[in-house]
UniProtKB/Swiss-Prot annotation:
The EC number(s) this enzyme carries: 4.2.1.9
Active-site residues, Swiss-Prot/TrEMBL: S517
GO BP term, example: isoleucine biosynthetic process
Residues bound to [2Fe-2S] cluster: C122, C195
Organism: Brucella anthropi (strain ATCC 49188 / DSM 6882 / CCUG 24695 / JCM 21032 / LMG 3331 / NBRC 15819 / NCTC 12168 / Alc 37) (Ochrobactrum anthropi)
Modified residues (N6-carboxylysine): K124
Reaction(s) catalysed by this chain's protein: (2R)-2,3-dihydroxy-3-methylbutanoate = 3-methyl-2-oxobutanoate + H2O; (2R,3R)-2,3-dihydroxy-3-methylpentanoate = (S)-3-methyl-2-oxopentanoate + H2O
Protein name (Swiss-Prot/TrEMBL): Dihydroxy-acid dehydratase
PANTHER family on file: D-XYLONATE DEHYDRATASE, D-XYLONATE DEHYDRATASE YAGF-RELATED
Function recorded in the entry: Functions in the biosynthesis of branched-chain amino acids. Catalyzes the dehydration of (2R,3R)-2,3-dihydroxy-3-methylpentanoate (2,3-dihydroxy-3-methylvalerate) into 2-oxo-3-methylpentanoate (2-oxo-3-methylvalerate) and of (2R)-2,3-dihydroxy-3-methylbutanoate (2,3-dihydroxyisovalerate) into 2-oxo-3-methylbutanoate (2-oxoisovalerate), the penultimate precursor to L-isoleucine and L-valine, respectively.
Listed GO CC annotations: cytosol
Gene3D superfamilies xref list: IlvD/EDD C-terminal domain-like
Cofactor(s) named in the record: [2Fe-2S] cluster; Mg(2+)
Amino acid sequence: MPPYRSRTTTHGRNMAGARGLWRATGMKDEDFGKPIIAVVNSFTQFVPGHVHLKDLGQLVAREIESAGGVAKEFNTIAVDDGIAMGHDGMLYSLPSRELIADSVEYMVNAHCADAMVCISNCDKITPGMLMAALRLNIPVVFVSGGPMEAGKVVWDDQVKKLDLVDAMVAAADDSYTDDQVKAIERSACPTCGSCSGMFTANSMNCLTEALGLSLPGNGSTLATHADRKRLFVEAGHLVVDLARRYYEQDDESVLPRSIASFPAFENAMTLDIAMGGSTNTVLHLLAAAQEAEIDFTMADIDRLSRRVPVLCKVAPANNTVHMEDVHRAGGIMGILGQLDKAGLINTDLPTVHSETVAKALDHWDVTRTNSDMVHKFYSAAPGGVPTQVAFSQERRFDSVDTDREKGVIRSKEHAFSQDGGLAVLYGNLAEDGCIVKTAGVDDSILKFSGPARIFESQDTAVLGILNGKIKAGDIVLIRYEGPRGGPGMQEMLYPTSYLKSKGLGKACALITDGRFSGGSSGLSIGHVSPEAAEGGTIGLVREGDIIDIDIPNRKIHLAVDDATLAERRAEQEETGWKPAETRKRKISTALKAYASMATSAAKGAVRKLPD
């Protein structure tokens, strides 16, 4: 049996000094034989998705100690992508994922912790902690802060649901008055929690359920609802049990790499495609798979995207449906249940809470259980009161949504689309692939051709859109915004939002080697690989070149002959792969360090040391 890692610092005469320091943290004689559990929190007052987490780490710690463990809490950083959006702050978002993963590794290995509870929530925090968990491969349970309630505003005697994207779009739309914009701003983000649509944060928290590393309801139970407290309480007890099973019973099945196996990654990606999750999840799953030493690639994502239908459409793909509605329909277990019935997932896999996914679905899928407890759990509703306090309300819907024909979650037979919510496109413009969230693309533009309007940065693209330089039929091409070229691979939420505000959301395309917020929709194609800074073809496109996009056939093609491209490449090699215009962008030493090691989006934008 493997020894408890913590014995390195708690046992033996020569560890008297370390024990003295442990005692100074509150440990007593009887604690030195117990598992030491790291409570990895991410509380910060900068981020609404994390503002309510301050006391939740200690809630988990108390439960760990009541279960017979020793709990020690520390915090990671957390960047709010929405606040960092639209300026150079976004350069730091993706690189922060690597810092979070490293900081968890540093703390856990430096202090020889035996297991972890990861309290995450927003965009890069869950992926960073997931990467760390798979890197360390010690028992872990994920429990996130939960989604925000959808905003609501009453106009013309009708209730309109809102989220962050509505505020961005309205601000750039001249048809809205200043008072209307202010009303949307005040109502769009009413509570603590991760933004209310199927954006990156909620997508990733849902995927931890599919990977088997979190409890049912983790991705969909509202941050404000009292039901969410149970997840934190159970996580504290569960992690102690997992630690004992591994260290005292030599049960390796409880380890993250045993649970988040290759077929579990397939399940997670299948879920993501079925619910039209954020394209950022592709980056993060690829990165996490590398930490787990699993050969899960863009080719696997492409394969899955061709056979998985869209079973759930949530904002931004459907602005009337938010995470609170997904929860009412049975949450992630409800979607997985329909994928299981369609034969699209592997249910023989273990989870942290159940022997197999199949057994978990038998208990937690609202369409196959008669459990009053489960139906009550998924009836949790928004409170409708602005608050930054977790578990502050207990409101419930009168019933859960089990309609799989016209409800929020559909069966395969009644899918929103038989073609999946994410697609990988290949062609001479993206030889290693690029990603589009098809769930957010109108059917009328699944095939699209148009002239490229070239921008060497997100900033100039925003100005071009707002100043009326983009017309219907154009393709906005933003380059040198990849992991190296940005550096940091900025999200393009403002350009996509401004296209919508100008009435061009269904009349234009946007292509970039950067990435998109989970809040983006429309014909938005990102992660073009290789990126321009790596010598990718996207760096050779010239103003007015025609680009052909064919989502049904998974193709993207620059209509320029090979000989001309070869000439352009030779010219570019002489001048270097850099923007054609000088950018007013200060790149710090920290960002330069990331850029020097960053791989392409096709590899998850992880760092790779030079050979």
